[in-house]
Amino acid sequence: MTLLIKLSIFAFSNQNIISMKDFFKYVGATVVGLIVFGLIVVIFGTMSIVGLISSAQATQNVSKNSVLVLNLSGSLAEQGSDDVWGMLTGNELGSVGLDDILSAIKKAKNNDRIKGIYIESGIFLANYASRQEIRNALLDFKKSGKKIIAYGDNYTQGNYYLASVADKVFLNPQGMIDWHGIGAQPMFVKDLLKKVGIQYQVVKVGKYKSATEMYIADKMSDPSREQTQAYIDGIWSDVLKAVSDSRKINVDKLNQYADSLITFSNPKDYVDAKLVDGLLYTNQVKDEVKKMFGLDKDDPVNQVGVTDMRSVKEESEGKQVAVYYAYGSIVDNPVTGSMFGAEHMIVGSEVCKDLEALAEDDDVKAVVLRINSGGGSAYASEQMWNQVEQLKKKKPVVVSMGDMAASGGYYMGCNANWIVAQPTTLTGSIGIFAMIPDMSQLLTQKLGIKFDEVKTNKNSTFGSSARPLNAEEIGYLARYIDRGYALFRQRVVDGRKLSVNQVEAIAQGHVFVGRDALKIKLVDELGGLEKAVEKAAKLAKLDEFYTQDYPAKASWMDQLTGAMSGGNYLDEQLRATLGEYYEPFMLLKTMNQQSMIQARIPFYLNIR
């Protein structure tokens, strides 16, 4: 009996041993299978991605009877790029580059297969200087004799400003036109910060340097209100004149429409007011498109998008004019560790390296520095100014200002050979400031954290957020700010060939629209990027030339890597979600990453 039990136990144990061997064998096979499957997925996935990108980047020929569709939707970036993550997920973000739009319009003008442009209105987030550049390109397109037709279910004020350039403007029978004038609503967070126990200590130069008001005041100062009023009046004046010229409507009438909120009128009133040429549904517009572009009713209309035009190549002849894009807040070094990415920053150290490389590149005969920035680090601005000075010794440098080139954005290129700005560009703001957060109340009273000190010198703990600056420290800082302001002012004096008194009279942090900046010699000419390129070629004495954009756009692999990390994708999602509140949000978010001394635009206006 005992022997039988032992034999049974042995048999059971032996069976378990066999089962465990089988188990590990099956697990191993499964793991190997998963690895092989993963490799296959990666290989075919990579092949699919390469196929997608290659097809998107392949050179295209425009079909006969094509129409360029200018879809005014999403947010406008200074430079466009392929949304690799969106291509993979089928959820491409609504962002298009100003460079792509301008290039597409220019190519459409010169392409005999493109009959005209169809403007489709949506929700389009763009500043007026960029809109002005697009509008001017559309006006230039019309010089070819080709037509433009515009249609919208609704028109925002900014989109109507663009659409009014069209030969025919149509609206949905149940649509509306938002026409109300321009207002500015600066945001103030002093009381919010006070609730959490934070206050800022500020040292600044310039009565108009109101960038700090957002944190230390609850309303606009008189100088800030004065320059803001002048700024929005300048923009509105341009909008009125442009619409008046295109639609043949008296400026006084347009103001009357805004004051009476014609936005909420019966759509038929828009026709009577000459704001639109007719009320049509989407399917009816197609017939109008064919009629206007000289096509038979049965002829197909081939639609070509702005991004499609990237792959329509033009001949590159002559010498190279480099167009270097610098847009976003100015920082000393790359911002790392952010879930939102940092693609919308001007990194001073990187720009200096790039400009140095352009100076040494014998193929580059002239450089256009395209600036769209409200400023940032005063230190980085000075370093870039110096690099422009070195670049100038070897080849002409022309600055093209976008929506804004103010404070540090003006500083970095004020010594260029020539400066071109749009009439509605925000520029100037010659001044600097320092802001130091005092978090002592948050830390000690709100959170109950106590601090003690051990130090070697009297001011060893200078700049600590755990205590406010004392009067002596503020005095030292003020003298440093004064020196920085004097240097900024001198850079403008030397770059613009003005006297100290002339610059001081227009400095103090004062901002100007491009038209007014021309009068006081802060800029040399009004116009867009195209005009700046032509000027650069002229200064370099080039009869034939082509342009090359710098820095080079990220490769699809770099974009995919960035997309997989989520940073830039989240940044674009945030931009699309917050819209006009994106810039002030990012300013608040990055305050602790910025250098203490700032040369920054005096406000984020939240223009409506």
PLM region descriptions:
Residues 6-16:
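Short, positively charged and aromatic/hydrophobic N-terminal segments
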Residues 66-186, 315-442:
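Cleft-lining beta-strand/loop regions that shape enzyme active-site pockets
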Residues 190-288, 440-520, 524-526, 530-536, ...:
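Charged, glycine-interspersed solvent-exposed loop segments at helix/strand-loop junctions
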Residues 245-246, 277-320, 433, 489-495, ...:
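C-terminal long alpha-helix characteristic of the crotonase
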Residues 340-346, 351-364, 398-407, 412-414, ...:
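C-terminal soluble interaction/assembly domains
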